[in-house]
Swiss-Prot record:
The keyword Chaperone does not apply. The lineage of its organism: Bacteria, Pseudomonadati, Thermodesulfobacteriota, Desulfuromonadia, Desulfuromonadales. Coiled coil: none annotated. Keywords: Hydrolase, Metal-binding, Metalloprotease, Protease, Zinc. This is UPF0758 protein Pcar_0065. A motif (JAMM motif) lies at residues 176-189. It comes from the Bacteria. GO terms for biological process: proteolysis.
């Protein structure tokens, strides 16, 4: 197989990222950029090495918690590459533990997922959080609304919008986790989101999104057309 440098430019992971953004790359392509080189002994490219890592570990989370010895068990992964992988995953964990700060601007569901994934993914109960935003989508305050099964009796519009009024927020964004690990919205999720949207409209407060966090991904109800 030809080396990555000999591929058509629009197929090379680095050029693809520069032209289309990191979101356009597969997990294997992102890993290839971290690894930078393949295994000369086997003739594997960096992309091949990325695919081998994905085959060995069922999920990125398992890969992120692997020891250097476990990473080096993959052909072509030596101490240097194992250390680079662990450094990247540790940075991701530290980023995920950093709370959003007042003044931080809401930019995308992906950014919210990146901030809350590490905090919420291991919780055994559902946590419902409201992010209160100003007219420029900058964070005013993060408010914990409830903990437990998500039902209308636990997430009441009065409890949600009282801090919105106190902070004079122009918009609000909701985040909650699914302990099952599957971020697919339940009927209750959809019903509560619709109810909160209607109350927000009456109060002149924009409900920007409701983002559900799972083990390996998220669902944005705004992207789904619910909001």
């Amino acid at each position: 197989m030809p080396a990555i440098k000999d591929w058509p430019e629009d197929e090379r992971p680095r050029e693809k990222l520069l032209h289309r953004g990191a979101e356009a790359l597969s997990d294997a392509e992102l890993l290839a950029l971290i690894l930078r080189s393949g295994d000369a002994a086997s003739g594997h490219s960096a992309l091949d090495q990325g695919r081998l890592l994905i085959q060995q570990f069922d999920t990125l989370r398992q890969m992120a918690t692997a020891t250097t010895s476990e990473l080096q068990a993959i052909k072509g992964i030596g101490p240097a590459k194992a250390a680079e992988l662990q450094a990247v995953f540790e940075l991701a964990r530290r980023f995920g533990r950093n709370p959003l700060r007042p003044g931080d601007r809401y930019t995308s569901p992906q950014a919210v997922f990146a901030h809350f994934h590490e905090r919420l993914r291991d919780h055994k109960r559902e946590r419902f959080i409201a992010l209160l935003l100003d007219s420029k989508n900058r964070l005013l305050r993060e408010v914990g609304i409830s903990e437990g099964s998500l039902t209308a009796s636990i997430v009441h519009p009065r409890d949600v919008f009282a801090p919105v009024v106190r902070e004079s927020a122009a918009a609000v964004l909701f985040v909650h986790n699914h302990p099952s690990g599957d971020p697919s919205p339940s009927r209750e999720d959809l019903d509560i989101t619709q109810r909160l949207r209607e109350v927000g409209e009456l109060m002149g407060v924009r409900v920007l999104d409701h983002i559900i966090i799972g083990d390996e991904g998220y669902v944005s109800l705004a992207d789904r057309g619910v909001l």
